[in-house]
Structures are given as C-alpha cells and as structure tokens.
Regions:
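Small/aliphatic-rich secondary-structure junction motif
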Residues: 1-59, 139, 152-221, 240, ...
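Gly/Ser-rich helix-loop-strand patches that form or flank binding pockets
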Residues: 14, 18, 92, 100-150, ...
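A short acidic, glycine-rich active-site loop
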Residues: 56-71
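A short, acidic, amphipathic alpha-helical segment used as a generic capping/interface helix at domain edges
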Residues: 207, 224-237
Length: 280
C-alpha cells in the first residue's frame, strides 16, 4: 500500500486540498497521512504588531495562543472525521518545527505529496508562488500534486512534453501512482521553435508508450514560445483537467530569476498540477 501525505496549515485549512487528498486515497486505496505543520514560529496574529504597536497584555497574548491551538485542533479533527467517514487507512502528524524543513523531511518517506498552491506560512504578502511553495517544489523528495483553491472532479489529463527525460519521468510517476486516472483521455502537448518541424519529439516511441497506459490519447504540436503557446492553448480547458509536467531541477537562484512552467500555469489556471523530477 502506497503512502500519500497531504500538508495542511491548521490555522487556515484548505478544504479543496483535503478533498483531493481524500478522493485520491479512496480511489487508489492508499494510506493517507495528514501532515499538519504546526510551526511554533507561525501564528494567526502578528506578535510584533501586538507587542510594539498595541502594547498587548500577557493575558491577551495567552488568549490568542489558545485560540490558535483550538483552530489547529479543530482542523485536525475535521480531517480525521472525513477520513473515518470514507473508511480510509490514515494517520495524522503534528510537526511543530520550521514548516518547510519538516515537510521536506516528510517527503523522503512518502510516495506523493498533496499540497495547496496557496500555502505560504507567512504573515507577509507574497507574490505567487510563495517562498514556501517554491522551496517545496525544488526540494521535495517525491512527486507533488499541487491543488487549486476550488475542488473539481478530474475528467481529463494533459501532459506537457518537452522532449526531455524529466517530463517522461513525471508521466511515468503519474501512471505508477494514480492508475485509476489512466482511463481518462490524455492530451499530449509539445511546443517547438518556429524553425523546427511539427513532428512530436520521439513521436513513435512516445505514442507507443502512451498507448500501453491510456485508452484515449491526442497529440498536439505547437510552435512558438513554450510559456506563451501553452497558456494560449490551455485557455479552452476547464478546471476538470489535471496537468502533468516535469519540474526543472534548477538552482534556487535560477528559480528566483525565472518562473517555471508550474508557476506560469498556477497563475493562469485553476487546475491541479502533478509535478515530478528525478532527485539526485
């Protein structure tokens, strides 16, 4: 039995992320671990503002901390009740140290991480993606399913194929981890430069492999800039599609300078993204 971990902010529980995690665990009959990142340094209130601007009393600070504990407890309880109602194999972890380090460590011992794209564990307003999301996608030791704000039943698979081994690896991991979704139609999208032909990279091998797994497949080759053409092509897609892509395992400096395809898609579409890269 494979193990899925679903990460949650107990102070701001993502209902959508919970639904995706429970649905997948139920369909695939996997063990589900709810990882509640109860980072001691993260609260629902800004201590600096309270202490230095409002002059908060110890009594008020204690009350606010207790309210946070109650929120986290209720979020965990809700997850537990949902899992019980679906008769899932599950357990719950409460990780109390630095959230990003705790989560990356959890991914070493997981087959799949399910995570809301809106998580930040920060009081500061951040441009999308948050630092928390960026570092998780870079350092995760298992594939990541990044979920949108709204839950939608998956009806179609879209695979972004750039001809590189990383993208093929992502598709292999998808087929390995989510076999119940292989009955859905898949659209393979590849974007080439204006100087190149319209042949799918390694077309014969790709089509041969796809047909071993998916019942219905379609192949689309576009020309132009990958980010631009992919976004334009996906405008017609609904939120019921799931996109598979290989995450570029670039340096952290490179990630800050140039957005990845995952960032581009998350900014423009409300679709779940299955992201995988080969760890080294």
């Amino acid at each position: 039995m494979k193990k899925i971990i679903a990460a949650f902010d107990g102070l701001n529980l993502s209902e959508s992320n919970m639904k995706y995690a429970i649905q997948i665990s139920e369909k695939e009959k996997y063990h589900l671990t709810g990882v509640f990142l109860d980072d001691r340094t993260y609260t629902s209130f800004k201590i600096y503002d309270l202490v230095f601007q409002e002059g908060v009393s110890e009594e008020k600070l204690s009350r606010l901390k207790h309210e946070d504990q109650t929120k986290r407890k209720n979020a965990s309880l809700k997850f537990e009740q949902e899992c019980i109602s679906k008769k899932l194999n599950f357990n719950i972890h409460h990780d109390k140290n630095y959230a990003i380090k705790e989560l990356i460590h959890e991914t070493i011992f997981a087959d799949l991480l399910i995570l809301s794209r809106n998580e930040s564990f920060s009081h500061h307003t951040e441009t999308f993606p948050s630092r928390f999301i960026t570092e998780t996608l870079i350092d995760a030791q298992c594939p990541v399913l990044m979920t949108p704000e709204t839950y939608t039943e998956i009806e179609k698979i879209i695979f972004l194929f750039d001809g590189h081994p990383n993208s093929i690896y992502a598709l292999k991991m998808f087929a390995y981890l989510l076999p119940s979704f292989l009955s859905l139609p898949i659209e393979v999208i590849s974007v080439k430069s204006m100087e190149e032909n319209l042949h799918l990279p390694d077309g014969q091998l790709m089509k041969e492999w796809i047909k071993r797994y998916f019942v219905k497949s379609e192949f689309v080759v576009l020309k132009g800039i990958p980010d631009v053409e992919t976004v334009a092509h996906l405008q017609k897609e609904r939120a019921s599609s799931m996109v598979i892509l290989g995450s570029y395992k670039r340096s952290k400096l490179s990630m800050w300078i140039r957005s990845s395809m995952a960032d581009v898609l998350s900014k423009n579409f409300d679709m779940p993204l299955f992201i995988a890269h080969q760890t080294r």
